[in-house]
């Protein structure tokens, strides 16, 4: 009788295994571009797999103000999705974008697949800002983007929890970092966004 149960368990696990393999494949597709960022001069050098597995070049946001935030669906700060979506809609037309990077590093609070995460964010918070594939954002296995962010931010050091927010100015440099406790709609965050949006877009570098 043990064999049928074993087979059933295996078959049940196939969708989960497929989701995991899909995420790994998506990251493998982007690894070359990630490695190019070892000598990066901006976080916008990096290419990540988006939530749908397609490569997402952060370079498309050159000249914009970018917030990169690691997210989780089962965290005490998950409700910040609502505020993030509101500021995204408020400032989007002025050249502001949010990049969500789901991660399971802290408390195992993002256990789902990329499809699960997309459904959760859309259903519960109406999220429309770009979401990336689930990634490692802390520890020795963290993706190169997060190595760059944590080393080049004015406040250096590894991130401690979900919903840490990095702000990148129109010049492509990391200019501010806000922790989990800082609400995305707080005066400190919105004032910084508005200050960065008021700055001119740098002229393209001469060939």
Residue ranges, per PLM feature:
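N-terminal "domain-start" segment that seeds a small globular fold
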Residues: 29-59, 144
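Amphipathic alpha-helical repeat scaffolds
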Residues: 70-74
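Bacterial N-terminal signal peptides
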Residues: 12-26
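N-terminal secretory signal peptides that target proteins for export/translocation
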Residues: 1-10
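Structural microenvironment flanking redox-active thiols in thiol-disulfide oxidoreductases
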Residues: 77-142
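Proline/glycine-enriched tight loop/beta-turn segments at coil->beta junctions
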Residues: 61-65
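Thiol-/selenol-based redox modules, centered on thioredoxin-like
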Residues: 144-207
